Amino acid sequence: MSYKSAIIGLCLLAVILLAPPLAWHSHTKNIPAIILITWLLTMNLTCIVDAAIWSDDDFLTRWDGKGWCDIVIKLQVGANIGISCAVTNIIYNLHTILKADSVLPDLSSWTKIVKDLVISLFTPVMVMGFSYLLQVFRYGIARYNGCQNLLSPTWITTVLYTMWMLIWSFVGAVYATLVLFVFYKKRKDVRDILHCTNSGLNLTRFARLLIFCFIIILVMFPFSVYTFVQDLQQVEGHYTFKNTHSSTIWNTIIKFDPGRPIYNIWLYVLMSYLVFLIFGLGSDALHMYSKFLRSIKLGFVLDMWKRFIDKNKEKRVGILLNKLSSRKESRNPFSTDSENYISTCTENYSPCVGTPISQAHFYVDYRIPDDPRKSQNKSKKYLFADKETDDILDEIDLKESRHIPYVTQGQSFDDEISLGGFSKVTLDYSEKLHNSASSNFEGESLCYSPASKEENSSSNEHSSENTAGP
């Protein structure tokens, strides 16, 4: 891929990605952020035009750029300083909010608007005006980068242009450090402070702004230091306006090929992508995208995407639950009711799992190993100890289930009754009752139920009547 196509493609994508954050901050009236994004948009657009015109081998014979380059070189000077000023203004506002030592002006108040405009635009506009004094030529044209400032290599260039980038980047770094200190000091009250100061920020928005400012400072501060040092190394001679603005060379358009794009293009692209990643992917921005798509009758796209996400989510959750359940399944070696369970044992899977005859194919067997006779005697003792238990069982709606809860009074953990009694109680208190239950349930274990109780009571009444009869 050539430099031309790379620059045009990356800058065009940056312009598209900067549109949503610009719309959002315009809605929230965040003036420093609006100015910052505007600078980045302007620089990306100029990079697209310059790369499209002056990137080919015949760039020397292309348009000389009169009019266009006169404007662009001023915007370049303003953007290099204006980005640092806007970021510093954002951090200054965050510091003011966190300090909470005075009442904050309303976002729509002229005091707030004027202060933000002065901090963000005064220095860039001033340097844009003074840059005319520093120009040796009207402008120059570099391959790939297009219009470029050609400034006088004297001390006045350092004073009127280069040092301001470093100053504002340094001020921004200092305020960023102060914000971190105040944030740590008041970390427990930050949420309340943001709410009570009428700042229009919540904790998430505050964190995004702070992270963004730190990243931009980490980019701009080294860049400003590098530019300042490089400028100092080139300082020579004395400045005179007459020699700098010589009428014989002023209108000469210098065209040169640096061999590759100058690094400031990549800085603009990088910062543009950072703006989108931090401000363009938040919940507020996503809600704005949704609202916009529905306003242009494209809401069905969101609905399709939502259904797709929900479907995949359910599928992933199902797979996860299956994996978890397969790990937790284990066979109880003390289970004896093999008739009631299906064996899911396979040759490649061990241990096998006994499951009830149901769609779920899961069971939990709470019974513990014990002497069957002793367990049955204990069960018999507590089951028929008094009539209160029977009364409780009568009040329980068992519907058609054979397995009923069994409630006893005063049972302790020393009682060795089967824990499976919470779902079913196997009883064998008499051989006759056992045989009767076995015939009724066709080989299954006898389960105590109201039906069996009624049958027993009716049989007892019938036998007593026979005994009492003549």
Swiss-Prot record:
Residues 300-470 are annotated as: Hydrophilic. It is found in: Membrane. It comes from the Eukaryota. GO terms for cellular component: endoplasmic reticulum; plasma membrane; vacuolar lumen. The chain crosses the membrane at residues 6-23, 30-53, 71-98, 117-134, 156-183, 206-228, 267-285. InterPro entries: GPCR_STE3 (IPR001499). Residues 1-5, 54-70, 135-155, 229-266 are extracellular. GO terms for biological process: cytogamy; pheromone-dependent signal transduction involved in conjugation with cellular fusion. Residues 440-470 are annotated as: Disordered. GO terms for molecular function: mating-type a-factor pheromone receptor activity; mating-type factor pheromone receptor activity. Keywords: G-protein coupled receptor, Membrane, Pheromone response, Receptor, Transducer, Transmembrane, Transmembrane helix. Residues 24-29, 99-116, 184-205, 286-470 are cytoplasmic. It is a multi-pass membrane protein. Receptor for the peptide pheromone a factor. Belongs to the G-protein coupled receptor 4 family. This is Pheromone a factor receptor.
